């Protein structure tokens, strides 16, 4: 009877989120929304403020222990990853979410005001970046997907760590700090990161590294306190793209345009800006909403 009850609760939670059968869709954004402490999907193919197409909240997910739900407050990043979404919150927790069910597949805890997450090769392996603890942390959820206290983890120092991205082409992890971008080698068998090279972007972008995003062609965009910078891993060179202040997230897309969130109040915004060539459209405004980051799903 208990198993039936849990399944029923899961179905109710998924239906409440409007998530049943939802899939990654072109032209949709996934966003971290800090007023409701939720992850939401938005149809961004046209300007305006449509209703959420999908939503996840830890407090409505029966797989999240009641005492752990508050550690998902202040979601700070989210990324579509196959049929899942990876999310992390400034209060310390992260999760892999199923788009189809609207429920967590696994979750864990890293602390230190985490700002970014990426999947590593290997079952249930993740890397995170935390700005207050100045660290990149690797975590395995494989054996204990819903028990953060039992999950092995290792932390590596990186000043004001804000971004992490796995590079499948080069088989390495990139991590963004306050003034530098670090390349790490990953060993699944040893559960170990090894720093390979450190790139200083201050001559081009100044300090304040905040967001790290793939450009879709093998390179990366970096946002700093004052500008948008492009990094070419093959040449090991940074290039100034545009002077944009306080960009929390930047997400390029050749079809739909380049989406970004920028500070309007404290560190939030009630809208997402999308630019394609000389054209600009606004997704929003949503009065009272507190977007932190937003990224294209596809």
Where is each model-derived feature located?
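Hydrophobic h-region of N-terminal signal peptides that target proteins for export
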Residues: 10-18
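An edge-strand/N-cap motif at the start of beta-rich repeat modules
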Residues: 22-46
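Short coil/turn segments that connect the beta-strands within blades of beta-propeller domains
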Residues: 25-27, 82-84, 122-124, 169-171, ...
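Conserved beta-strand positions in repeat-built beta-propeller and related beta-rich domains
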Residues: 31-35, 86-91, 127-132, 173-178, ...
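Short loop/turn segments immediately following beta-strands, especially the blade-tip
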Residues: 43-49, 140-146, 185-193, 233-238
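A short beta-strand motif characteristic of beta-propeller blades
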Residues: 52-69, 103-108, 148-156, 195-203, ...
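Blade-loop segments of beta-propeller domains
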Residues: 56-85, 89-92, 102-116
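Repeated scaffold domains used in trafficking and secretory/extracellular systems
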Residues: 66-79, 111-119, 159-165, 204-215, ...
């Amino acid at each position: 009877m208990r198993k039936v009850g849990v399944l029923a609760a899961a179905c109710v939670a998924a239906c409440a989120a409007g998530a049943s059968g939802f899939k990654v869709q072109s032209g949709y954004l996934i966003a971290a929304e800090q007023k409701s402490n939720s992850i939401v999907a938005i149809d961004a193919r046209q300007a305006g403020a449509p209703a959420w197409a999908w939503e996840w909240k830890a407090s409505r997910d029966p797989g999240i222990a009641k005492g752990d739900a508050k550690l998902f407050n202040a979601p700070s990043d989210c990324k579509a990853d196959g049929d899942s979404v990876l999310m992390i919150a400034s209060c310390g927790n992260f999760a892999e979410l199923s788009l189809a069910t609207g429920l967590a597949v696994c979750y864990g805890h890293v602390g230190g005001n985490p700002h970014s997450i990426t999947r590593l090769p290997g079952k249930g392996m993740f890397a995170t970046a935390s700005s207050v603890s100045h660290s990149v942390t690797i975590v395995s959820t494989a054996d204990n997907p819903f028990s953060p206290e039992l999950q092995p983890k290792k932390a590596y120092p990186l000043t004001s760590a804000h971004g992490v991205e796995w590079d499948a082409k080069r088989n390495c992890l990139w991590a963004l700090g306050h003034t530098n971008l670090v390349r790490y080698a990953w060993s699944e068998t040893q559960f170990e990161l090894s720093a390979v090279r450190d790139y200083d972007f201050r001559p081009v972008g100044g300090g304040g590294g905040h967001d790290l995003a793939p450009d879709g062609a093998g390179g990366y965009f970096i946002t700093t306190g004052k500008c948008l910078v492009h990094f070419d891993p093959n040449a090991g060179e940074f290039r100034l793209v545009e002077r944009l202040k306080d960009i929390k997230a930047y997400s390029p897309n050749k079809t739909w345009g380049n989406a970004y969130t920028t500070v309007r109040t404290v560190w939030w915004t009630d809208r997402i800006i999308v630019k394609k060539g000389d054209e600009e459209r606004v997704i929003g405004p949503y009065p009272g909403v507190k977007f932190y980051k937003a990224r294209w799903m596809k």
